[in-house]
Amino acid sequence: MTADSASINLTHHFLIAMPGLEDATFAKSVVYVCEHSERGALGLVINKPGELSMQSLFEKVDLPLHRQDLINAPVLQGGPVHTERGFVLHDAMWADVPEQETPAKTEPSDGEPVASGEASHEAVEVVQEDAIEAAQEAEALSAVSHKESAKESVYASTMTIPGGLEMTTSKDVLEALSIGAGPKRVLISLGYSAWGEGQLESELAENSWLTVGADTAVIFDTPVEQRYERAMKLLGLEPWMLSNDVGHS
């Protein structure tokens, strides 16, 4: 990796697939980058709906859903890694703790990982640990992010992302949504996207992706089918303006 590529940090950015990127998973995709460092990157595709609605997902994990604003929302295909497991992107939910104490987070009884229902909860490993294993490929996901100053997330297994967002992998966030509480803005995906050391930088050098700082309105307030064009517009672009060729001439 060059010094220039090592200095790139695309955390809280969008990766926007160039028109010529024909990969089945990432063609015309917008990826929200949750974590990026010299060790790799992790993100969620935010514009590829899967077959499940949120209501269907909640039924599969034996929870009601009393959030009318979420019932018909699609569960997204976040990427090709661990597609049976849920990743919840949402506005940050803080819990105040005494400033003099910085306790390490322990796994409470409601720290069960989010799963799609295709495997029993007992058979599914804690997703946070799985993400760390995947970090051997991407080395991108911190075990549990320690929050700045005297604040930490109210949920058991959460990564804090600059820009006021969190990604939670424990079932407690679904339990909060189930009773009509929880974060106001929510995106749920099955699976995530990961890049190993230098891999994303190589793809950027090949002109596979455009990058732009993330706008949370695109994630949460824009219809799924419009997110690709809306992300492009953050750069002042339309898809027709770009060449279908990927790579250097």
Regions found by a protein language model. Give the residues of each.
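A short aromatic-anchored loop/beta-hairpin motif
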Residues: M1-I188, S193-S249
